[in-house]
């Protein structure tokens, strides 16, 4: 286990995939050629299937396009299954893939419950399972994603810093995503731990939009009508929260209501920052997450361990981004293909 974890650190820090396979070079006299031979045996020709909650969102598309590019270079067969926000369909796709028996499944859970049993069955069938950003209640071989409690705390502290001083109404509103997802639960827990320390902050609305831009827009419009002196809106995902931004602009409150959001640095986040529609975006870089998912998948394939042996977590760093520090590389363009 120590060797696996040490290798994981090397993989993620340097992009190096040589420390697994047959073991340390110095200890066993392995040559670079022998390591490459073992790597080819363990990795090349293997199959990875990626099942996001939808492939029609910029975030999940960035993950898929980046992983597909890496897989092509590594000689890994990579495919994508799109349930298009249909939870029942996602469960059916996962069950179908278990029967097809790929080497690795990369799964994006809509909530903590619905895919848990299927993920466990996948491991029992000899398939490695990597969960991304939204974990299930079942711990699979690996989790890659932002640490949601930390994310929620960081965002809430930003809200407090912006709205806790004199001259502010101290009123804020929250826009959750899917309330039963581990990601949403963690953000809420982290945020509330901060807000409880600042009783001057008044939460006038706490609603959920289920990741839907229009729902977020409509609910925000109602809140803004009731509270035109709102100081800030804190949302759980930039794709959803673009609807809040439009509601703020339509209400004539641009520059008055500060929108705090988060996401993988996908469009239109950076454009919204430079235009003043978003105040601060707590970015967990989507391309880095894709790199992490592929590195972990390679590690598992080379480990020789039975699926279900390891429970590894790899947390993506959070990059607070505003109009002052946003750059051309802060966000990732996404292809429509």
Where are each of the predicted segments found?
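Extracytoplasmic "Venus flytrap"
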Residues: 30-66, 70, 74, 78-92, ...
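Flexible loop/hinge segments that line or gate small-molecule binding clefts
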Residues: 112-150, 171, 265-274, 278-279, ...
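Hydrophobic alpha-helical
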Residues: 104-124, 191, 209-271
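Hydrophobic alpha-helical segments within soluble ligand-binding/sensing domains
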Residues: 35, 42, 90, 144-170, ...
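Hinge/cleft segment of the Venus flytrap/periplasmic-binding protein
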Residues: 28-46, 175, 179, 183, ...
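Short beta-strand elements at the ligand-binding edges of bilobed clamshell
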Residues: 80, 136-161, 174-176, 206, ...
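Short beta-strand elements in bilobed, periplasmic/extracellular small-molecule ligand-binding domains
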Residues: 72-83, 171-174, 195-213
């Amino acid at each position: 286990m120590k060797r696996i974890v040490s290798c994981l650190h090397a993989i993620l820090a340097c992009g190096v995939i040589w420390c697994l396979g047959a073991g340390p070079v110095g200890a066993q006299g392995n040559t670079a050629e022998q390591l490459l031979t073992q790597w080819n045996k363990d990795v090349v020709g293997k199959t990875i299937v990626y099942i996001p909650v939808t492939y029609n969102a910029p975030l999940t598309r960035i993950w898929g396009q980046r992983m597909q590019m890496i897989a092509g270079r590594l000689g890994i067969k990579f495919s994508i299954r799109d349930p298009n926000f249909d939870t029942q369909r996602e469960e059916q796709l996962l069950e179908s893939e278990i029967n097809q028996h790929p080497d690795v499944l990369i799964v994006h859970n809509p909530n903590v419950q619905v895919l848990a049993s299927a993920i466990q069955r996948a491991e029992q069938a000899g398939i490695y399972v990597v969960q991304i950003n939204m974990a299930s209640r079942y711990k699979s071989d690996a989790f890659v994603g932002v640490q949601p409690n930390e994310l929620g705390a960081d965002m809430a502290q930003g809200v407090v810093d912006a709205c806790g001083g004199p001259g502010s109404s101290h009123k804020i509103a929250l826009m959750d995503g899917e309330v039963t997802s581990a990601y949403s639960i963690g953000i809420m827990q982290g945020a509330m731990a901060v807000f409880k320390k600042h009783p001057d902050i008044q939460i006038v609305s706490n609603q959920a939009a289920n990741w839907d831009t229009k729902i977020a827009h409509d609910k925000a419009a109602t809140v803004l009508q009731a509270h035109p002196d709102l100081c800030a809106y804190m949302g759980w995902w930039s794709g959803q929260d673009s609807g809040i931004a439009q509601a703020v602009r339509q209400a004539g409150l641009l520059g008055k209501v500060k929108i705090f959001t988060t996401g993988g640095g996908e469009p239109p986040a950076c454009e919204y920052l430079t235009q003043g529609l978003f105040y601060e975006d707590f970015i967990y870089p989507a391309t880095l997450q894709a790199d992490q998912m592929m590195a972990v998948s390679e590690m598992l394939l080379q480990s020789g361990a039975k699926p279900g042996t390891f429970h590894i977590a790899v947390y993506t760093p959070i990059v607070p981004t505003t109009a002052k520090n946003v750059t051309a590389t802060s966000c990732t363009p996404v292809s429509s293909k």
